[in-house]
Amino acid sequence: LTIALFEVVASLRLTGTFDPEEITAALCRVPTDQWRAGQAGPAPKLRRRSDGWVLESAAGAGHVGEQVDRALDELAPISDRLRHTLSARETSGCLCVAVDTDGQGRPVIALSAAALRLLAASGLSLDVDVVSGATDNPDPATPVIQAASTGHPDGPFHRTVVSWCAEDAVSAFLDEWPDRSMASQDRPGGEILVQAEMSVGSFPSMYFHPHLLARLASTAMSLRIETCPRTT
């Protein structure tokens, strides 16, 4: 199976109530951008509602999962400092991943078990935003999203939800996963596959809260998100 390459930009974004210079000192990293609440935003008439600090990795064409791994490799040395910074301040942190398809396909979001562990250890959320560039109006119908696992010893385990959010399917899956009582080191690994039936130009919301990433990391499984054409 050939997975298409797309332009991907990953960035660490911290927002909340803090002095950006203190974040720079705590993480020992020079930000790509920073701002204080009340400063002008991207549009002249908009004002920032919170303080912000952004560290962007270089943009590049590649598989989405590989680019996420690259960004996390850069964050790995400061994972402990990052988690302490988030817990010690009124601050939330997110690894934001922008994927530009230029209307040329449907990206596959593949996250390794190691990537999920590092995200969980750092206390970050994950937000994958797909920019399709499609000119067609997206179908407003709510998509059907299925989550299945190859990691259960008794065979595949499935859950289906009707939602715009991939997080809902993963959460419903984990709530009833038969292996949830097992210790992660005793689990056989495997993959959680999320498939969303979408119209052309539409993609599910792929925002994952820190607590759900921690639950995912505890399964010792990887996560794969695919979109496929709507069948009805």
Predicted feature residues:
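Acidic (Asp/Glu-rich) sequence patches and key acidic residues
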Residues: L1-T232
